[in-house]
Amino acid sequence: METLKDKTLQELEELQNDSEAIDQLALESPEVQDLQLEREMALATNRSLAERNLEFQGPLEISRSNLSDRYQELRKLVERCQEQKAKLEKFSSALQPGTLLDLLQVEGMKIEEESEAMAEKFLEGEVPLETFLENFSSMRMLSHLRRVRVEKLQEVVRKPRASQELAGDAPPPRPPPPVRPVPQGTPPVVEEQPQPPLAMPPYPLPYSPSPSLPVGPTAHGALPPAPFPVVSQPSFYSGPLGPTYPAAQLGPRGAAGYSWSPQRSMPPRPGYPGTPMGASGPGYPLRGGRAPSPGYPQQSPYPATGGKPPYPIQPQLPSFPGQPQPSVPLQPPYPPGPAPPYGFPPPPGPAWPGY
C-alpha cells in the first residue's frame, strides 16, 4: 500500500490494466514473504522427520515379526492350559471326598463279599487249607483297612459341613455404637474412673495404739456406740533432737540476775528417781533441781494433777440394750508409772474430736 501512495493517477490506471504487475506487487508484499518462509520451514521439518522415521523402519519390522511370533506362542500356551485345566477338573471330580468315599465303600463291600465267598468255599471243601490261609487273611486285612479309611473319610466330610452350619447359624456381629457429635465449643468430657476403696478399718480405735508417735488421721463425725469404755491417750512431744536451753534450777532463786516467781517454781515430786551428776549435760536436768536458765522463763514439764492420771478419761458411750455392764471401775488402759523427763502437758480435750 505504501508503494501505491507515491504513484500518480495515470500510473495507477496503467497498473490496474497490467495483471503481471499486480501479481509481482502481491508477491513482493511482506505478508506473502512471511507465509513463504513459514512454508519452506515446515517442508524442511517434515523432510527431517520423514528421514528419521525411515531410520526406525527396520527395528519396527523386526519388533512386529517378534510380536507375531509371541502371539502364536501365546495361543499355543492357552490351548495347552485349557487341556490341562480339563484334565485337572476330571481328576478333581474323581478325587472329591464324596466320590472317594463312595468308591471306598464299594471296594470295601466287594472285598468283604469275596472273603465271605472264599470262607463258604472252604467250608464246602472246594478250597484247600493252604490256599485259604494265604488268601483269606490278606482279604480280611484289606477289608479292615478299607473300613477304617471309610470311617476317617466320613469324619473329614462331616467337618466342613458342621463348620458351615455353625457359621450360618452364628448371629451377625453387632455394629459399633454411633459416635455422638460433640459441639466445637464444648470440651471433651473425661469419664472419671471409680477409685478403689481404702484399706482402713471400719471403726477407728478409741485410743492411740502408739502414744509416742504423732496423732494420725482423726475421725470425722459421730462414731457408732462401742461396747467397751472409750478413753483417750495423750500424745507427748519428744522435743527437738538438738541441744535445748537448760532448765531453770528449782528453788526460790534461780541464776544470778534473774528473779524466779513461785508460779514458775515447782517442788520436786516424791517417787521419781534423781539423775546423777555425771549424766547431766546440755538439755538434761541436774540432781536436786533444773539447770540454770540463761534468762528465758521455763515451764514445768509436769503439771499438777492432784492424784489423777496425767491424761483425761472420757466417759463411757451408751451401750446397746441387754449388754452387761462392767462391775469394776474404769481404769486407764496403761498403768501409771514414771513419766518421761521431757514433754509438754497433754491437750485439754480428748484426742479424738469425733466423740
From Swiss-Prot:
Its protein name is Vacuolar protein sorting-associated protein 37C
One Gene Ontology CC term in the entry: cilium
Give the record's subunit note: Component of the ESCRT-I complex (endosomal sorting complex required for transport I) which consists of TSG101, VPS28, a VPS37 protein (VPS37A to -D) and MVB12A or MVB12B in a 1:1:1:1 stoichiometry. Interacts with TSG101, VPS28, MVB12A and MVB12B. Component of the ESCRT-I complex (endosomal sorting complex required for transport I) which consists of TSG101, VPS28, a VPS37 protein (VPS37A to -D) and UBAP1 in a 1:1:1:1 stoichiometry. Interacts with HGS and STAM2. Interacts with CEP55.
Domain of life of the organism encoding this protein: Eukaryota
Q: How is it modified after translation?
A: Phosphorylated by TBK1.
Q: Which residues carry this modification: Phosphoserine?
A: S29
Member of which family?
Belongs to the VPS37 family.
**What are the GO MF terms of this UniProt record?**
calcium-dependent protein binding
